[in-house]
Amino acid sequence: MEEGVSIYLVSDSNVDTAENIASIAAAHFDTFIEKIKKYPYVGDKNQIEEIIMEAANDANSIIIHTMVVPELKDYLLKKAQKFGIKIVDVMGPVINAIEDSTGISPHTNLAKNNKEDYLKKIEVIEFAVKYDDGKDAMGILLADVVVIGVSRTSKTPLCMYLAHKYIKAANLPLVPEIEPPQELFEINPKKIFGLTIDPEVLVKIRKERLKSLGLDANAIYATEERVKKEIKYAEEVMKRLGCTVIDVTNKAVEETANVILNVLKGGEIS
């Protein structure tokens, strides 16, 4: 019997290009494609680690990516090779072929044609990476938008999505045992967006994450009691801040981002 294939689509932007190519290829082997998983707006090495661990658990997996940020792209390749996972760079060969044929550096070409737009995009993406997961409280003061919430509410991919909309976004995890930094209470609450989620849904998400990492799915991190405690604490912090709260239960990253963009324009949560 033929062995099934699991396809992982990975990008630091949307996965449309990778998905289109994968779909065309899969049409020739549709009876042997076990699953196709999408990972858009990948913004840090931890996300890459999770993707790699999940792909490594599949007997026959392929990663198709359109990563642009050099540091993350190289890290993805390195990790995939370490675990013997097949990896396809969709954009790289095309860009390299054009560069070889024309003698024009892709970076120079982009900068020449649209320097201001290109540099701004790189700046906000690097900002999202630098101030991800509360790494530096200074990001709270510098950001256009600050996203807060408990673990596994898609804060990082949301900030990467906003970066592609030219918005400097920082994010901060809320944990009962750790008091939020004072900087969070010093900025305009209109810049802060709190993410909440249905406890049962979050329990399932966390259990799946633990499984993908080869850890015990029944760890305290994924228990109903712990999840409810964290969500209650997070919502109390959001109330203290007086910030906008968004329920991300069963919401795609794009949907949550559109809510934020609408609020920033003076609209309301729909």
UniProtKB/Swiss-Prot annotation:
Keywords: Kinase, Nucleotide-binding, Serine/threonine-protein kinase, Transferase. InterPro entries: Kinase-pyrophosphorylase, PPDK_reg. ADP binds at residues 149-156. NCBIfam families: PRK05339.1. It comes from Thermoanaerobacter pseudethanolicus (strain ATCC 33223 / 39E) (Clostridium thermohydrosulfuricum). This is Putative pyruvate, phosphate dikinase regulatory protein. Bifunctional serine/threonine kinase and phosphorylase involved in the regulation of the pyruvate, phosphate dikinase (PPDK) by catalyzing its phosphorylation/dephosphorylation. The lineage of its organism: Bacteria, Bacillati, Bacillota, Clostridia, Thermoanaerobacterales. It catalyses: N(tele)-phospho-L-histidyl/L-threonyl-[pyruvate, phosphate dikinase] + ADP = N(tele)-phospho-L-histidyl/O-phospho-L-threonyl-[pyruvate, phosphate dikinase] + AMP + H(+); N(tele)-phospho-L-histidyl/O-phospho-L-threonyl-[pyruvate, phosphate dikinase] + phosphate + H(+) = N(tele)-phospho-L-histidyl/L-threonyl-[pyruvate, phosphate dikinase] + diphosphate. GO terms for molecular function: ADP binding; ATP binding; phosphotransferase activity, phosphate group as acceptor; protein serine/threonine kinase activity.
